[in-house]
Design a protein with these regions (language model features):
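P-loop NTPase motor domains
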Residues: 3, 10, 53-71, 79-312, ...
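Structural motif
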Residues: 40, 272, 336-339
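Generic enzyme active-site microenvironment
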Residues: 50, 281, 317
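Short, solvent-exposed amphipathic alpha-helical segments in soluble enzyme
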Residues: 242-245, 364-365, 402
Length: 411
């Protein structure tokens, strides 16, 4: 028996990307493994971003000097109107920002809005950002007119948008032209639908949604954890928007930091060993990556495919293999989750039920020997079958007394 040294961001001819998948039944040590990974990357000086669905990561995050924010409004707000750095091109960032807000709006309208209403919504957004001074009056966005990375208080809030909608509707003047007048009436009705939606959001969910982003210099925070325990209990139309916005903020961080590292490395200003990486952790991912939150699954798929370019990786964790691998009986949404998990280079498989063995054999033919497969149901706490590239290793993870105290709540 020897020691096991693991770095998520080691690249070889077989290990080409930095995504990982952790399976482990309750009590198998799945969350402990994730916390060990967080500790390691923090010691390396890398960035860590966590989605915490159970509220158990706070002691570790704070011990490592990180920031912990509950997204239910207790600790502050993530402003969905803040434009994230989701691409190296500012114009593309705007397009993706409108796409994000449109997706969230559609979710809040529970898919009851037609394409014409969505078109009106995107037009109102552009006019609003121009009136607010974020977008130039001609609507043209260039690298010389940055719209990303501004101080959080520079961006509008949900109540600002509601004020703009009220004013826009009150000041509307119908056209004397009959044809255009009819179009104007349709526009007015659609704009009023948008206004009504945001009025409800500000009145009933303002403490969660309406305000500037609470954490300043968020991209400079090494370890950041969003607690979504209470958020997951909200109605899906509200919950999905908050989760989607949180994912976009994490993606913003990866692109922003990764682009800087890429430029420094390609200009030979830093060596490969000096690159700062970003790791996103999603524990109990079955709470978010499911048919109820399809837009979140799509966004995570984009991130999983693109993060390698930005020296970043995602670690998904869930309990049973059968939670996500449904085989031929999977729905379209379930297949999307399966496709997402297929993007993982590393797999850590902890204790599973015996019924999972046929699923493993079918999903990963030839990947595991018969002996390895039949070891999985009898793995003890802290033991995992680790696959990295073309290697399988059975590894036992241990914790110190200090870690035992910090990891309390999920082991």
């Amino acid at each position: 028996m020897g020691s096991f040294n693991f770095n998520l961001f080691t690249k070889t001819k077989k290990r080409l990307s930095y995504n990982a998948l952790v399976y482990g039944a309750m009590g198998s040590g799945k969350s402990t493994l994730l916390k060990k990974l967080i500790e390691v990357q923090a010691l390396f000086g890398d960035y860590v971003r966590i989605l915490d669905p159970s509220g158990e990561y706070q002691p570790l995050v704070e011990a490592l000097g990180g920031k912990y924010l509950s997204l239910d409004g207790r600790d502050g707000i993530l402003n969905e109107f803040e434009i994230q750095k989701t691409d190296e091109n500012e114009g593309t960032c705007w397009v993706q920002h409108v796409s994000k807000l449109t997706a969230i709006y559609r979710l809040r309208r529970q898919n009851q809005c037609g394409q014409n209403e969505l078109n009106t919504y995107s037009k109102l957004l552009l006019d609003f950002y121009i009136s607010f001074g974020i977008i130039p009056k001609d609507g043209k966005i260039t690298q010389q007119t940055p719209i990303c990375g501004l101080p959080s208080e520079y961006y509008p809030t949900m109540s600002d948008f509601l004020t703009y909608l009220n004013k826009r509707i009150q000041e509307y003047e119908p056209s004397v032209d009959a044809e255009h007048g009819e179009l104007g009436k349709k526009f007015l009705l659609q704009a009023d639908e948008v206004r009504s939606t945001y009025e409800n959001l500000v009145r009933n969910y303002g403490s969660l949604l309406d305000g500037h982003t609470s954490i300043q210099n968020i991209s400079q925070t090494q370890i950041l954890c969003f607690n979504v325990y209470t958020v997951l209990k909200l109605e899906p139309a509200i919950c999905s928007g908050i989760l989607y916005n949180a994912l976009m903020m994490y993606w913003d961080h990866c692109v922003r930091v990764g682009s800087r590292m890429k430029a420094l490395y390609e200009n030979r200003e830093i060596a490969e060993r000096d690159i700062i990486h970003s790791m996103v952790i999603m524990d109990e991912s079955h709470h978010i990556l499911n048919a109820q939150f399809v837009d979140c699954v799509r966004q995570m798929t984009v991130m999983a495919r693109e993060m390698r370019k930005y020296f970043s990786g995602i670690v998904f964790a869930t309990q049973l293999i059968t939670d996500n691998l449904k085989g031929d009986n999977a729905s379209t949404e379930e297949k999307a989750v399966q496709d997402l998990f297929d993007l993982a280079t590393y797999r850590f498989i902890g204790k599973q039920t015996a019924t999972c063995i046929p699923v493993l054999e079918s999903k990963f033919p030839g990947m595991y020997t018969e002996t390895e497969l039949y070891r999985i149901p009898s793995l003890d706490m802290g033991s995992f079958m680790v696959t990295a590239g073309d290697q399988n290793l059975e590894v036992k993870f241990f914790i110190t007394e200090t870690e035992d105290h910090l990891f309390a709540g999920g082991r």
